Structures are given as C-alpha cells and as structure tokens.
Regions:
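Metal-associated gating/positioning segment near the N- to mid-region
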Residues: 6-69
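Metal-coordinating catalytic core of metallo-dependent amide/deamination hydrolases
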Residues: 75-214, 243
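Generic structural signal for hydrophobic
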Residues: 43, 71-74, 193-196, 228, ...
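Divalent metal-coordination and catalytic microenvironments
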Residues: 8, 19, 43, 47, ...
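Long, well-ordered mid-to-C-terminal structural blocks that present hydrophobic/aromatic surfaces
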Residues: 204-234, 239
Length: 288
C-alpha cells in the first residue's frame, strides 16, 4: 500500500457520477466511431466510487442487458453501480418489456434514460409520449422505493426545455421527476435551465462539455453553477455529471458528423476543484 502525507490536504468521499457510458457510446459517425467499454481504473482515478450507467444514441447494437452485466461486473470489482433502462429513442429499449417493470423488478435500475429531447437524434415523439414514460418511471419508483427519474438528454434544438414544461403543465407530474442534462451545452439552453430550476425543476451540468475559446457558446460547468446560484437557483436543485466514456460527436450546420471524441470522467474532479478554488464555493457546498 501507499501512505500519503495528508497534512494540509482535504479528504472527501468518493464522487457519485450519475451519467456514465460504461459499455461505451457513440456510433453517430458509423460503426468505427463506437467508443469501448470503460475500465475500472478510469473511474477510480477520477475520484469516483459510484456510477450510474446508461445508453445513448445507440439502442440497437448496445443493449440494456449488457449495461446491467457491466454494472454488476464493476460492482464485483469494488465500486457501487446503478443503471438507467432505455436510450435516446422512443419507445425506449428495456429488459422486461416496460420501464415500470424494469424499475420494480431489477435492483440496479433506478429510472429511465437518457431520453433525447430537442435534438436531431431524438425520435421526435409527441409530448404525450414523453409524459407517458415519465409517469411510468414515477410509478415504478413508487412501487419499488426508488427515485424513478427520467434522465433527459437535452440537445442543441431551439425548443430547449419546452417539453419538460409541457410534461408537467397539468401539475400531476412533479418537476423533479425529470433530470435535464447537458444544460451547459449552449447559452440559450443554460438560460432556459436557470428559469426551469428557479420554478422548481432540476438542472444537471455536464463537466466534460467545456468551451474551447471565448466565442464558444458552451458554458463552463464551474462558472455556470456560480451563475445559477447567483441567479437564485437553490443548490439542492443543481447536479454535475461527466457523460464519461460517451462520444463527443461534432456536427456541421446540416447535422453531418465531421468528427468524434471521447468524454473524460476526470473532468468531474477538475470542475469540483474549480468550484472551490476559482468560484469560491465552500468545500461542503461543492460536495452537496
């Protein structure tokens, strides 16, 4: 073992990363752009001890069953794991035939996602379909004592969080049933997410989305959290995840894939440090 001199240092609990493509992601540029399964060392060296695995664009050559198997394997290696049942598409893939049954009957399934909205890769489903799957997840969570949440992938579309407002408009489904993620991908979406969170909803930043220069519309996670807090968003309604091991496709103005990268999970640790050292949050608030 290695002994580390800890004088003057801070020891904190391992991070929970609620958005990790543990069996890989991508494929938007063809089969050669599929990212591989994640290795345990990529998770632990980023300070993460709990991961929530999920599928993304590809619900055809990747399966929820494989996701569950990978989650069990990682837990056997020493970390805690959970998964979402589903993918971008609607109807979304499951193990038992329904989101509700997956959540109730499979111990590791805590919700569904990531369901794509406001994105050219979504199924372009009507709001009624999104409302139905949110209700399925909620009831599944109630029956099993789980969160039963919907992880909602929000793209660059101009609708931003319009669907979330319509899903909850009649007041039956709580605004906290869905977790809109990637809210810092552009300034328009970020502003809409702040309004949504101030009205009682949640907002999830993606730490691996980072601006390349001053003209980039992407909002840096640590700076965005500071801005959201200053705008009056309660800390308890803000979260950060990495999108680790997922693909980072680059599209032109016509939606054509022109490049791809892989998201790093260690971005979570970097943004945590920046929250404390650059944005002035206390250690306890940054960990909340």
């Amino acid at each position: 073992c290695q002994v580390i001199e800890g004088n003057g240092l801070f020891a904190v609990p391992g991070f929970m990363d609620a958005h990790v493509h543990i069996i890989g992601g991508g494929g938007e540029g063809g089969f050669q752009t599929r990212t591989p399964e994640i290795q345990l060392s990529k998770i632990t060296t980023a300070g993460v001890t709990t991961v929530f695995g999920l599928l993304g664009t590809d619900g055809i050559t990747r399966h929820v069953e494989s996701l569950l198997a990978k989650a069990r394997g990682l837990e056997n290696e020493g970390i805690s794991t959970y998964i979402y049942s589903g993918s971008y598409e609607m109807p979304t893939p499951t193990i038992t035939g329904s989101v509700r049954r997956d959540i109730v009957l499979i111990d590791k399934v805590i919700g569904t996602g990531e369901i794509a909205m406001s994105d050219h890769r979504s199924s372009q489903s009507p709001v009624s379909a999104y409302r139905e799957i949110t209700a399925e997840a909620r009831v599944g969570g109630m029956l099993s004592g789980k969160a039963g949440v919907v992880n909602m992938h929000i793209g660059d579309g101009t609708d931003a969080l319009k669907y979330l407002r319509e899903i909850t408009a009649n007041g039956e489904l709580p605004k906290t049933q869905g977790i809109p993620t990637h809210v810092n991908r552009n300034k328009h979406l970020f502003a809409d997410a702040i309004d949504w969170a101030k009205s009682g909803g949640l907002m999830d930043f993606t730490s691996s989305i980072a601006p390349k220069d001053d003209d980039d519309p992407v909002v840096k996670t640590s700076k965005g959290i500071r801005q959201a807090l200053d705008a009056g968003v309660p800390l308890r309604q803000i979260s950060v995840s990495s999108d680790g091991n997922g693909s980072m496709p680059i599209f032109d103005d016509n939606g054509n894939n022109i490049g791809v990268g892989v998201a790093n999970e260690d971005s979570l640790l970097k943004e945590f440090r920046d929250l404390v050292q650059e944005e002035g949050l206390s250690l306890s608030d940054a960990l909340t």
